[in-house]
């Protein structure tokens, strides 16, 4: 997992509530078991015209000024719907490192933490300020300080200390377990052999 400490990036405002996993990555694109290749189909039904499959120039991800943004600012209940880890893979593959929402589906939130996508919760008033920032401007997400900053604004957020440790150190669940390899081996030697 890639380390995340401080992200300095523009934001993509997509201030809609109840964006579900099928809107994030539609079911017809779930045939792959790899974690890559999903970014091109992120928000597919909004990014492309239904009749011609051409890019919809009005959708924010298709606007050139937002192409390099790594932070998505969105509404309440993000990632609701079916349990679909592919939704997180699509966001990561597109280039997002951080999603700032009012709330998340529990399963989506856990999938995010396990796949290196930092999911931050902020109240609507704070997200409204962030969503209004011009495309060329950048904000700072400072994980060690648990802050989102832009000019005179500073928004504090909470995160589970273990997840914070995992993000800052680039550790996934397997890497955390491997930190205890010697203790696990010692314990296994103490267990009676029933053969």
Curated annotation (Swiss-Prot):
Keywords: Amino-acid biosynthesis, Branched-chain amino acid biosynthesis, Leucine biosynthesis, Lyase
Known EC number: 4.2.1.33
Keyword Amino-acid biosynthesis set for record: yes
Swiss-Prot/TrEMBL catalytic activity: (2R,3S)-3-isopropylmalate = (2S)-2-isopropylmalate
Family: Belongs to the LeuD family. LeuD type 1 subfamily.
Any one GO CC term of the record: 3-isopropylmalate dehydratase complex
Single GO biological process annotation from the record: L-leucine biosynthetic process
Pathway the protein acts in: Amino-acid biosynthesis; L-leucine biosynthesis; L-leucine from 3-methyl-2-oxobutanoate: step 2/4
Any GO MF annotation of the entry: 3-isopropylmalate dehydratase activity
Cited InterPro entries: 3-IsopropMal_deHydase_ssu (IPR004431), Aconitase/3IPM_dehydase_swvl (IPR015928), AconitaseA/IPMdHydase_ssu_swvl (IPR000573), IPMI_Swivel (IPR033940), LeuD (IPR050075)
Coiled coil regions, renumbered to chain: none
Family annotation (HAMAP family): LeuD_type1
Subunit structure comment from the entry: Heterodimer of LeuC and LeuD.
Keyword Oxidoreductase included in the entry's annotation: no
Origin superkingdom: Bacteria
The protein, known as: 3-isopropylmalate dehydratase small subunit
Gene3D superfamilies: Aconitase, domain 4 (3.20.19.10)
Organism: Oenococcus oeni (strain ATCC BAA-331 / PSU-1)
Role description: Catalyzes the isomerization between 2-isopropylmalate and 3-isopropylmalate, via the formation of 2-isopropylmaleate.
């Amino acid at each position: 997992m890639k380390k995340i400490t401080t992200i300095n990036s523009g934001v993509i405002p997509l201030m809609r509530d109840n964006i579900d996993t099928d809107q994030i990555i539609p079911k017809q694109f779930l045939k792959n078991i790899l974690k890559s290749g999903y970014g091109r189909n992120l928000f597919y039904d909004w990014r492309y015209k239904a009749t011609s499959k051409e890019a919809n120039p009005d959708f924010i991800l298709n606007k050139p000024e937002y192409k390099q943004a790594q932070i998505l600012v969105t509404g309440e209940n993000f990632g609701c719907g079916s349990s679909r880890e592919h939704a997180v893979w699509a966001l990561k593959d597109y280039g997002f490192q951080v999603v700032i929402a009012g709330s998340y589906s529990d399963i989506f939130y856990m999938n995010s933490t396990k796949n290196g996508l930092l999911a931050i919760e902020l109240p609507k008033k704070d997200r409204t300020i962030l969503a209004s920032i011009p495309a060329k401007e950048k904000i700072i997400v400072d994980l060690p300080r648990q802050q989102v900053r832009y000019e005179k604004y500073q928004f504090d957020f909470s995160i589970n200390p273990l997840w914070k440790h995992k993000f800052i150190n680039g550790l996934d669940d397997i890497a955390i377990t491997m930190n205890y390899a010697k203790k696990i081996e010692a314990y296994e030697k103490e267990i009676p052999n029933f053969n």
